[in-house]
Amino acid sequence: DMYSKSTAAMSTYAGILTDQVLSMLKGEE
């Protein structure tokens, strides 16, 4: 249903965002 689909999309998006932030922080060190 809509809710579980949007939740899955959000967790995927959050995972990608976290990954980008971590690699950005690593690059600045």
UniProtKB/Swiss-Prot annotation:
For molecular function, the Gene Ontology terms on record are: phospholipase activator activity; phospholipase binding
Q: What is its main location?
A: secreted
Record-given protein name:
Apolipoprotein C-II
Q: Which family does it belong to?
A: Belongs to the apolipoprotein C2 family.
Q: Please explain the role this protein plays, according to its UniProt record.
A: Component of chylomicrons, very low-density lipoproteins (VLDL), low-density lipoproteins (LDL), and high-density lipoproteins (HDL) in plasma. Plays an important role in lipoprotein metabolism as an activator of lipoprotein lipase.
Lineage top rank: taxon: Eukaryota
**InterPro entries membership:** Apo-CII, ApoC-II_dom_sf
The Gene Ontology biological process terms listed for this entry are: lipid catabolic process; lipid transport; positive regulation of phospholipid catabolic process
**Organism, per UniProt?**
Ateles geoffroyi
Which GO cellular component does the record give, naming just one? very-low-density lipoprotein particle
Question: Cellular location of this protein?
Answer: Secreted
Q: Enumerate the UniProt keywords alphabetically.
A: Chylomicron, HDL, LDL, Lipid degradation, Lipid metabolism, Lipid transport, Secreted, Transport, VLDL
Q: Which Pfam families does the UniProt record give?
A: Apo-CII
